[in-house]
Amino acid sequence: DVYKRQFNQQTNVALDNKYIVLDISELTGDLLTVGMFVALDFVWDKAKENRTAEKAIFVDECWQLIGASSNRQAAESVLELAKTIRGYGGSLVCATQDLNDFFALDDGKYGKGIINNSKTKILLNLEEEEAQRVQGVLHLSEAELMEITHFERGSALISTNNNNIAVEIKCSQMEKELITTDRRELAELAQRAAPKQH
């Protein structure tokens, strides 16, 4: 009955848009699992529609799908997507802030599988334990390991084809406004966007 109320309705989303965002962050418990399956199934079906069209699938907070408390079927779905998306003219971008959770389910099987199927990896500042966990998977040197545990905001290590390079990421003001999570900056943006009172 709960599932009927949540999922058996007309959508208010235009599913033929160039960009489609499926936000399941407000779902919890069993609804989160069902929501993940519905979202992944939809995204995968869309990706397979046209092999000649380029497409990208972004999975933010990927640890929720492959972490310790995740559903193995959801984790298998994400791993299958990572392994096969390129064959459909697509790319998969997985983002997480917690690499420990990324490697928590089934001794890291899903996290390692996703990383091993990723051509490019971008690492921001990591805690020492997280850095050590990823060191073997990405073949990081001791110097690189030390570097990623001391990165300042905007610093990253890009790893592709077993080549690693430290970079400084600079964004435009517009990009910064689109991606910031800083509360002060968000409040400032909201204040600027609010209609002026006369």
Predicted feature locations:
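Acidic, low-complexity intrinsically disordered tails
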Residues: 186-198
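Conserved ATP-driven motor cores of ASCE-family P-loop NTPases powering translocation/secretion/packaging/pilus
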Residues: 69, 73-75, 79-172
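Short, surface-exposed linear segments at secondary-structure transitions and domain or protein termini
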Residues: 174-185
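Short acidic, S/G/P-rich loop/turn micro-motifs used as interaction or catalytic elements
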Residues: 27-29, 64-66, 99-101, 129, ...
